[in-house]
Amino acid sequence: MHLPHDAGPGNDDYLVSRRQAWFAFAMTFGLMLFDYIDRQVIVSLFPYMKADWALSDKQLGGLVSVISVVVATLGLPVALLADRFSRVKSVVVMATVWSLASITCMFTRNYGQLFAARALVGAGEAGYGSVGAALIASLFPRRLRSALLGAFFAAASLGSVAGVLLGGAIAARWGWQAAFGAVGIPGLVLALLYMAVRDYKTVDIQNATQSGTQQSVGTLVRRTVSQLAGNRTLVWACSGAAMQLIVVSSIWSWLPSFLNRYHGVAADQAARQAALVVLAGAIGGFIWGTLVDRCALGRAKLRLAIVAGLCLLTMAIFLAAFGLMAAGPAQFGLIVLGGFVMACTVGPISAVVFDVIHPAMRATGAAVLSLAQNLLGLAVGPFLTGWLSDLLGLSTALSLVPLFGLLAALAFVRAMRSYESDMQAVAGIRVSAD
């Protein structure tokens, strides 16, 4: 079977019409927004839940981390199925499940029930980021890839902002459990609208695995995983992204509680201030993606070098803010600056992954990135910080976690060695619209 070629430097076109592509982006962005609204609304509710249910910081962190663990566990098989069947229909099912699960959280009456409902939210969200990113990467020209993926994943930051703000405001007026129901409904509406998004045709996996024989599902999975695991750039890029997300998820999850405890502000005001930091991350994610795209034109490895430097800058800023400065406006200003820098990996590293992955495995390759980000990054950060907080205090915990930025930088430097050769290995392979 002839495999059409992917958009390359000489054929940098939209896969579908511009209107269809941008509609797909808008819908995919909107669902990513509510994905993270539903995921992060809980962090602004921590002070209320701690008071009502007498929960430890470790237990509170577990309510955030459980979603990431489930997403990491189910993300790869869900993305593999989406790659073989329909990305659009898969997204509709995912959004419906996580929205209904979020609404269910409203009716829980103890920690165990809420923990189970949050796990179900994660089951619905599993694979969405990778499938949505694969769709965007395929419908748009390569020259826009980092910027659009940065914007798409910035929806995670914007959703976190909205979740924190909505959670704090709703909890102060109607009680903290009402917040879960309020944020779950819009996702159901977007899931219905997503049926109008145009997919791209599934590429024959036999070409991707260089085999013309019929394969069993087990063989297909083994071949796919083997090929992805052998991609050195993918492995190191995923590792670096995970290390940086330990820092990001810790700040996102625990900043409202930090401001409430150490700056002495009310829970709803702490939520608004924390939302400003997350918003800075959303803006930074888009800006860094655009700047890295421009700086790396014709110099692919520079993309990873810039991101490594920004990870080190993030570490330095947060070490100074939480480790050296007293609580006050100056400390908060430095935290906002750190929030702006810390989302530097989002667009560029996603673009790196898509640059080195065969089109037949884009959603699956993105799921590997998502698995690393969720299991080794997003799941670790909130729980580790909560555990350290119970032992050493929240301020000390937040001064230690930024050290993971050094590990992130080292991983990206290592990925630079193989990036260009891995990218050339899949150059010239194209997909077509469905």
Model regions and ranges:
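Conserved MFS/SLC helix-loop-helix module at the cytosolic interface between two early adjacent transmembrane helices
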Residues: 73-109
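Extracytoplasmic gate region of multi-pass secondary transporters
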Residues: 42-43, 232-286, 346, 350, ...
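Cytoplasmic membrane-interface "Motif A"-like loop-to-helix N-cap segments
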Residues: 84-95, 294-310
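Juxtamembrane intracellular "pre-TM" segments in multi-pass secondary transporters
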Residues: 10-17, 201-238
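Helix-breaking motifs and short loop linkers at transmembrane-helix boundaries and internal kinks
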Residues: 54, 86, 107-113, 124, ...
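C-terminal ends and interior cores of transmembrane alpha-helices
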Residues: 96-109, 312-326
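Cytoplasmic helix-loop-helix junction between adjacent transmembrane helices
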Residues: 117-157
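Helix-loop-helix hairpin linking two adjacent transmembrane segments in secondary transporters
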Residues: 152-202
